[in-house]
Amino acid sequence: MKEYVLLLFLALCSAKPFFSPSHIALKNMMLKDMEDTDDDDDDDDDDDDDDEDNSLFPTREPRSHFFPFDLFPMCPFGCQCYSRVVHCSDLGLTSVPTNIPFDTRMLDLQNNKIKEIKENDFKGLTSLYGLILNNNKLTKIHPKAFLTTKKLRRLYLSHNQLSEIPLNLPKSLAELRIHENKVKKIQKDTFKGMNALHVLEMSANPLDNNGIEPGAFEGVTVFHIRIAEAKLTSVPKGLPPTLLELHLDYNKISTVELEDFKRYKELQRLGLGNNKITDIENGSLANIPRVREIHLENNKLKKIPSGLPELKYLQIIFLHSNSIARVGVNDFCPTVPKMKKSLYSAISLFNNPVKYWEMQPATFRCVLSRMSVQLGNFGM
């Protein structure tokens, strides 16, 4: 009988911990970048192990003569700890837990009731790569909270009550998501020295054009910025020239001026849907010659924007739900076929006054197929 109980205990100890779907999603989200990150300071790594064993989330169980993982890892009460991931979401926490393992790479604290990040909450977490604090009640983050997290790459602060972007963020940060807070201003030195920052998501904040101080993005190489659902009345002119994606949907922009995109010549995706745009000045789109996708749906345009035929790489253009009453035969395609490097894969024109039978078939001569054009209930 004793032998049976002992075997049962060993079986239970060897069982894998249960991961909620949100944890699995977060793990997959950070998997690729984490595997590509050097981990030379990990004392547990063996030089003789293959690449699969060295990855943060190995596809097979770690090698052990007795058990597939440590029986007694240091882990905050109520949390799940595995493969240097500490999963503490949905626990009703009011503060950052103690006893977080020093070698933690990802810390998930979302869906709690944390109001403040204190100076020493992340002290000693020198290997921290991803920190998730979405959907808490944060109003304050201590200026020295990230002093020791010099390897932090992803910081998620969405759905909180922060009135400003935290100061002294790690210079290593590549992705900052601070969606749906109360941020009204981006100060000049907010991103100073953050040369690794590539993604900035800060939609659903009460930010207007005056809230972006001159020089706020000086020296940074951000590729993706989303400031949707804000209070912008025009395209911001002081964003990084390295931008590949700019999403300004659901604002109050009424006009696109000639100089608006002059700084963003590398732009490939532009989101201006659900604004109040009545006019796009001639020549303004010529400043983004590499653009591949433009969203202008749900605005107040009365005509097709000029300059589309000259955009050699444009593949997707959404113009539905506007006030367009006429479409010319050369509004989308160049007169010289060889000028177009990429054919259109999607053109949407439904919910406009223009009738489909009033458009000449040659209007869409540079699309991949008839199904690429959406005219409401009628395809081409």
UniProtKB/Swiss-Prot annotation:
PANTHER family named in the record: AGAP008170-PA (PTHR45712), ASPORIN (PTHR45712:SF2)
Gene Ontology annotations for the cellular component aspect, listed alphabetically: cell projection; collagen-containing extracellular matrix; extracellular matrix; extracellular space
Positions annotated as glycosylated: 55, 282
Gene: ASPN
Induction note: By TGFB1.
Disease: Osteoarthritis 3: A degenerative disease of the joints characterized by degradation of the hyaline articular cartilage and remodeling of the subchondral bone with sclerosis. Clinical symptoms include pain and joint stiffness often leading to significant disability and joint replacement.
Name by which UniProt lists this protein: Asporin
Positions of the UniProt region annotated as Interaction with TGFB1: 166-212
LRR repeats: from-to residues: 103-124, 127-148, 151-173, 174-193, 196-219, 242-263, 266-287, 290-312, 313-334, 335-357, 358-380
Signal sequence region: 1-14
Keyword Cell cycle included in the entry's annotation: no
Sequence ranges of Acidic residues compositional bias: 35-54
Organism, as annotated: Homo sapiens
Family in the record: Belongs to the small leucine-rich proteoglycan (SLRP) family. SLRP class I subfamily.
Localization of this protein: Secreted, Extracellular space, Extracellular matrix
Chain segments carrying region Disordered: 35-59
Database matches in SMART domains: LRR_TYP, LRRNT
UniProt KW keywords: Biomineralization, Calcium, Disulfide bond, Extracellular matrix, Glycoprotein, Leucine-rich repeat, Repeat, Secreted, Signal
An annotated GO BP: negative regulation of tooth mineralization
